[in-house]
Amino acid sequence: MKNEITLNPTYWASVSGGKDSWYMLNVILNNPVKYPLNGVVYFDLETDYPFIKDVINLMKKRVKNLGIPFLCIKPRKTWKELYNKFGYPNRVVKWCNYNYKLDCKAQLIEWERSKGNQVNFYIGLCVDEEKRYKNKEYKNSIFPLVNENIEEKYILEWARKQEIYNDYYKYNNRCGCIGCPMADLKKEVYNYLYYRPQWDTYMRLALESEKEIEEKYGHPYSIWQGNPKYNTEYRMKRVEELANLLKGEINK
């Protein structure tokens, strides 16, 4: 078509600071011919674990020493602003992803497009995560770990030996945000033991959202599950019980 605009391809490694994206970045940097790289981007979220910032700083130092741009992009609205508008995110209304995290991605795409470029993202999904990397969400994406036939269990074994992760991968397989509504109890116990102030804050906010919804609709509600029995109050009690059991085992 005469009016069709041809965009120039650019290649950006999208890193979260979790185990897979860090391992992927190492693969990319060690194979510059196979994986051309215009820059590295980190979506800078308030809800990230403190150790993630330490990992990102290590990445940034290595990348900048190679003369490669490293961008940190924040969402245009803060987590608290969106919380005040939508309430606590849950398993159905995942604004923490679409309205928060993915806004960072949209900003990079808009910026590159304004220069006549089409962004291709390197994403840290492993070869045994087929359902995820075939998701239509990952349009214009490249998966180096898939190309290199690297399984998640191999990276998990590596991550458990990295002190910078503050024992996270000794108890968990994947890293998300501290207050994630999809988190299982194992992750919540880790949060309770290692990041208690943050855990307290997110539980308080979840309680407030549940109370508002219950008052509005006149029936019990749970952020975490479809059954309102398993609400935040129940979750807090269960996490405290499991955390005390774990501390008892550690102290034996």
Task: Tell what function each PLM region has.
Residues 1-252:
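Nucleotide-activated chemistry modules centered on ATP-dependent adenylation/adenylyltransferase
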